[in-house]
Design a protein with these regions (language model features):
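Electron-transfer interface patches adjacent to heme c in soluble/periplasmic c-type cytochromes
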Residues: 78, 99-165, 169-173, 202-213
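Extended intrinsically disordered, low-complexity coil regions enriched in Ser, Thr, Gly, Ala
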Residues: 155-162, 169-197, 227-236
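N-terminal secretory signal peptides that target proteins for export/translocation
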Residues: 1-7
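Detector for the c-type heme attachment site
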Residues: 83-89, 165, 201, 221-222
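Bacterial N-terminal signal peptides
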Residues: 12-23
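Boundary at the C-terminal end of the N-terminal hydrophobic targeting segment
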Residues: 31-35
Length: 242
């Protein structure tokens, strides 16, 4: 009897242990390990980000993994340079110069102009030919690091995060108009809010994690300083590199 009871107890213990093992194998932790949020997934994004960076990166005193992830987000997912550049930002290697003209089909290869990369200056302001523009010139900002080594005119990370979370315009470039359009210069008419960035899609980007924002910030610290375009009425685009 004692032997039978011992064997029965042992069998119950083995079944219980097997149930625990199956549960662990099918736990959310294991599912995450096979998903995009896994360490392997992030390593792949870091590797791809470092591979597609279009300019030389200064990795001295930088977190290499954060820089790689930031490059993946800036260059591979968000196309920040598409807005934060002036002049010929991208030159697609196809005979037509346009990746949407299939001659031949676009293969993903492009050349980035380092002279304009993330230097700002693209105008999202009045429509051409509008005799009574209701909005001023809205230039994309210079995102590259200044002489402090911090991006976008020396922003701290807290300021940088605030921009993504709340759309805050720390430059206060566009005050609210007090006496109609254009008074004062560069003013925004109601219902636009002069304290907010008007073009940047921060209402979407505010959903990025702090880790993602830290990666973007670290990447922007690693790109070369761009002195920015010389545009009349937009001195805030100028960057002091040294």
């Amino acid at each position: 009897m004692t032997t039978k009871r011992s064997l029965k107890a042992l069998g119950v213990m083995l079944i219980f242990a097997a149930m625990i093992a199956v549960g662990m194998l099918n736990s959310p932790t294991q599912v995450r390990a096979n998903g995009e949020g896994s360490d392997d997934g992030e390593k792949a994004r870091i590797h791809r980000g470092l591979a597609i960076a279009p300019v030389h990166l200064n990795l001295h005193n930088k977190d290499r993994d954060l820089v790689g992830l930031g490059s993946y987000l800036v260059n591979g997912a968000m196309d920040c340079n598409g807005c934060h550049s002036s002049g010929p930002a991208n030159e697609y290697i196809v005979p037509t110069g346009n990746p949407y003209f299939l001659s031949p089909p676009f293969t993903g290869k492009q050349q980035i102009n380092p002279a304009t990369y993330l230097g700002g200056g693209r105008d999202f302001g009045p429509f051409p030919g509008d005799p009574f523009p209701s909005i001023p010139h809205l230039y994309s900002r210079n995102l590259t690091p200044d002489h402090t080594g911090r991006p976008s005119g020396g922003l701290t990370f807290d300021q940088f995060r605030n921009i993504f979370r709340n759309g805050t315009d720390f430059d206060h470039v566009h005050p609210m108009c007090t006496a109609g359009p254009g008074d004062p210069d560069n003013c925004l008419v109601a219902p636009f809010n002069g304290d907010l960035l008007q073009v940047m899609p921060w209402p979407v980007y505010q959903n990025l994690t702090d880790h993602d924002l830290q990666a973007i910030y670290e990447y922007l610290k690693a790109v070369p300083c761009n002195p920015g375009p010389d545009i009349e009425g937009a001195p805030y685009l100028q960057n002091t590199c040294e």
